[in-house]
């Protein structure tokens, strides 16, 4: 049967999605399933790995049934995933020995403090391009081995496996036959040397993580293995692409040339700039990471990770009951007229790039008796744009490249007010693509290249198209005044302490 589609599995922080893409890179079908969040203690975030797999299996079945697609028409599967989230499981039974510790979780912050006190920061920075932070997988694995009885001894015997979510999905989809990850996910573990492209013995010793439990690191676009037949009605489908969610979005946005950048506005906000074959060491609080590895060549990116973006609107909706639904935020923000001097610094789990302060809480500034919920909503939406400017300033400083345009994706960019305000605050055009699901599309492209469904990156780049281009329209003095207010709010937030 002729291959007509590529399937992307997009395993995110709050839901799993399965999506079909045709040869034109258009969405041909989608299914989505949410799963539970576990909060054992303040600042801790965990997932049940079995529940994640159930959500993935369910979406695949729903997608095939709803789209009435014959599995033989699927050329391959691309996987993209929430990065850094760590799973440890028993190789014999396939059962996790603890919950998955999520990228947002701060439960390893004490381990990070100890590593910093021991003087490991520069070594980690030089080898991994990362900072010592609870965000990354390495300290999560150490925490599991430290806290689950007998785990480290079992890991040393080769009885346990570690993986980021991509590894966990592939292990299960192949029936335990394949234990792999790709360069992008490995580069987020704090255990992988992004220059030698190997798991690093010194980093593993620092974390006391046995090498026997680590997955094999492969390229981002190749056939890793075949699915078991029960998931695709008796057919085996090749799993042929892997990328962490933000790198997948960079690929899906066709940012193939050095200096091209994208920003994804989701739960958090993640801005990546392609730096080509050069791993640019950041002096301004950004991360150096692997963009992808294809055809024997690795390319790099600078990244600014903002921990709280769209979730600040969710907080207004669910926590403060100011909104009926998140999509109402555009109307509320426009109705406010301006922010009336109100700033929200959404440091609910500290601040990420370029500040990297896990010890601070969020704050609201500039309240008066005249402050309305519309002002709150506008300040929340504006906070995404201000944080993005913080990151862009650092990115241009590190790279020496002045950004010509920003390709934007993610749920929040559907908000026209947000997109226009972002362009105004950056003084850079913001481009929203026709296909909004760029993360899943990037994974599909990687799998499609490996299976010959698409011939080249040049073919992919021609498919990328703009839905709407937002041009800067704000006076420069107003832009600078608004941003100065934000900077004051951040400075005040970092100076506030609760004993």
Swiss-Prot record:
Binding residues annotated for ATP, in chain numbering: 13-15, 267, 310, 314, 411
Cysteine pairs bridged by disulfides in the record: none
GO terms of molecular function: ATP binding; glycerol kinase activity
Keywords: ATP-binding, Glycerol metabolism, Kinase, Nucleotide-binding, Transferase
One GO process term, biological-process aspect: glycerol-3-phosphate metabolic process
InterPro entries: ATPase_NBD, Carb_kinase_FGGY, Carb_kinase_FGGY_CS, FGGY_C, FGGY_N, Glycerol_kin
Activity regulation, free text: Inhibited by fructose 1,6-bisphosphate (FBP).
Keyword Metal-binding annotated: no
Reaction(s) the record says it catalyses: glycerol + ATP = sn-glycerol 3-phosphate + ADP + H(+)
GO terms for cellular component: cytosol
Pathway as given in its UniProt record: Polyol metabolism; glycerol degradation via glycerol kinase pathway; sn-glycerol 3-phosphate from glycerol: step 1/1
Top EC class of this enzyme: transferase
EC number of the protein: 2.7.1.30
Residues noted as binding ADP in the record, renumbered to the chain: 13, 17, 267, 310, 411, 415
Binding site for sn-glycerol 3-phosphate: 13, 83-84, 135, 245
Family in the record: Belongs to the FGGY kinase family.
PANTHER family the UniProt entry points to: GLYCEROL KINASE, SUGAR KINASE
Function: Key enzyme in the regulation of glycerol uptake and metabolism. Catalyzes the phosphorylation of glycerol to yield sn-glycerol 3-phosphate.
Protein's name in the database: Glycerol kinase
Organism field: Xanthomonas axonopodis pv. citri (strain 306)
């Amino acid at each position: 049967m002729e291959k007509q589609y590529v399937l992307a599995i997009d395993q995110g922080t709050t839901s799993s999605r399965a999506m079909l893409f045709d040869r034109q890179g258009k969405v041909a079908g989608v299914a989505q399933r949410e799963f539970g969040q576990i909060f054992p203690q303040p600042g801790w975030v965990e997932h049940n790995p079995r529940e994640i797999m159930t959500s993935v299996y369910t979406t695949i079945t729903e997608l095939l049934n709803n789209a009435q697609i014959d599995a033989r028409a699927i050329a391959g599967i691309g996987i993209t995933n929430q990065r850094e989230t760590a799973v440890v499981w028993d190789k014999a039974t396939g059962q996790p020995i603890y919950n998955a510790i999520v990228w947002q979780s701060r439960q390893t912050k004490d381990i990070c403090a100890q590593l910093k006190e021991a003087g490991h920061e520069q070594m980690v920075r030089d080898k991994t391009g990362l900072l010592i932070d609870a965000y990354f997988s390495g300290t999560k694995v150490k925490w599991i081995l430290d806290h689950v009885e007998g785990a480290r001894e079992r890991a040393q015997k080769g009885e346990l496996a570690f993986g980021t979510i991509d590894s966990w999905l592939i292990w299960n989809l192949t029936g335990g036959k394949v234990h792999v990850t790709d360069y992008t996910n490995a580069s987020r573990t704090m255990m992988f040397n992004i220059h030698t492209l190997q798991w690093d013995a010194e980093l593993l010793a620092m974390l006391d993580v046995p090498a026997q439990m680590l997955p094999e690191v492969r390229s981002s676009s190749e056939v890793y293995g075949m699915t078991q037949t029960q998931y695709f009605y008796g057919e085996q489908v090749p799993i042929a692409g892997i990328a962490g969610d933000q790198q997948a979005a960079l690929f899906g946005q066709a940012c193939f040339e050095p200096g091209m950048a994208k920003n994804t506005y989701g739960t958090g906000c993640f801005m990546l700039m392609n730096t080509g074959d050069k791993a640019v060491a950041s002096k301004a609080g950004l991360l150096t990471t692997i963009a992808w590895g294809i055809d024997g060549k690795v390319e790099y990116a600078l990244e600014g990770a903002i921990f709280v973006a769209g979730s600040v609107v969710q907080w207004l909706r669910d926590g403060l009951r100011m909104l009926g639904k998140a999509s109402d935020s555009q109307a509320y923000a426009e109705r406010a007229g301006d922010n009336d001097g109100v700033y929200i610094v959404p440091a609910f789990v500290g601040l990420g790039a370029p500040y990297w302060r896990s010890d601070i809480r969020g704050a609201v500034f500039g309240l008066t008796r005249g402050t309305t919920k519309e002002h709150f909503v506008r300040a929340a939406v504006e906070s995404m744009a201000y944080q993005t400017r913080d990151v862009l300033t650092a990115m241009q400083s590190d790279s020496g490249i002045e950004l010509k345009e920003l390709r934007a994706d993610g749920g929040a960019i559907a908000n026209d007010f947000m997109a226009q305000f972002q362009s105004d605050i950056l003084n850079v055009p913001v481009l929203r693509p026709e296909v909004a699901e760029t993360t899943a599309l990037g994974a599909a492209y990687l799998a499609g290249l490996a299976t010959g469904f698409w011939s080249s990156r040049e073919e992919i780049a021609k498919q990328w198209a703009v839905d709407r281009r937002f041009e800067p329209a704000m006076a420069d003095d107003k832009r600078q005044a608004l941003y100065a207010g934000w900077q004051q709010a951040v400075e005040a937030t970092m100076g506030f302490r609760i004993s």
